[in-house]
């Protein structure tokens, strides 16, 4: 596919280390780029693999000279960390995650991701920081579909007495893939209008009421 081979690095966990700042580290030192999206390399590989297989099938079933047109993967999910990403992948989806919850996705990084997928979902934590960052991302890139986990999840406590807040916690209560698909079905973008071309080539716009309510809610109107 013509892309450069990336340097490999590993994240080492020491969850029982008494020093919180040393519970994980990266090795070899200096190999991890300053900005890095975990899962993006795997997403690209899945995209190229799918299109390679689709193109072979196209060539097998088409005798004309019409070239094969590359297709995007249906979706990918921004998750809030490794645990959530493993849960997402266990259901057959492509996870992406950042090195910290406060990471700001750049416009260039967003465009790069959207080369490979039709829809990008975000599954933020439902604590204060997660809601704030999830709202911020939704309003920055208005085509991202935000999967808000249900409020009832926070009524369950972890071993430190804190409310449950992430996808891994949710999957401890809802293990069926159809439950996750229901979450996906309720995920909305902040873009509240749709556009299409008429038969004579004119562009038309229409308000999507559900997305408009979502946009207003993201901006603090309830």
Predicted regions and their residues:
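Phosphate-handling DNA/RNA-contact segment within nucleic-acid enzymes
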Residues: 1-116, 134
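Short, aromatic/basic amphipathic alpha-helical patches
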Residues: 132-143
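Short, acidic/turn-prone active-site loops that include or flank metal/cofactor-
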Residues: 99-104, 125-126, 151-153
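Conserved NTP-binding/hydrolysis core of motor NTPases
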Residues: 74, 85, 92-95, 119-121, ...
């Amino acid at each position: 596919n013509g892309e450069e081979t990336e340097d490999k690095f590993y994240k080492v966990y020491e969850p029982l280390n008494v020093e919180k700042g040393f519970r994980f580290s990266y090795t070899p030192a200096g190999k991890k780029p300053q900005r890095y999206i975990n899962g993006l390399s795997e997403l690209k590989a899945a995209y190229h693999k799918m299109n390679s297989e689709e193109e072979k099938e196209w060539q097998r079933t088409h005798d004309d000279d019409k070239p094969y047109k590359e297709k995007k993967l249906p979706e990918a999910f921004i998750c809030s960390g490794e645990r959530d990403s493993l849960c997402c992948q266990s259901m057959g989806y492509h996870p992406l995650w950042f090195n910290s919850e406060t990471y700001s996705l750049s416009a260039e990084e967003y465009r790069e991701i959207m080369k490979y997928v039709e829809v990008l979902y975000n599954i933020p934590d439902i604590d204060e920081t997660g809601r704030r960052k999830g709202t911020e991302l939704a309003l920055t890139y208005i085509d991202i579909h935000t999967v808000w986990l249900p409020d009832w999840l926070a009524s369950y406590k972890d071993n430190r007495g804190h409310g449950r807040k992430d996808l891994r916690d949710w999957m401890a209560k809802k293990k069926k893939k159809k439950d996750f698909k229901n979450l996906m079905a309720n995920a909305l973008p902040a873009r509240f209008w749709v556009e299409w071309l008429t038969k004579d080539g004119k562009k038309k716009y229409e308000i999507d009421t559900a997305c408009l309510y979502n946009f207003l809610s993201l901006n603090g109107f309830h």
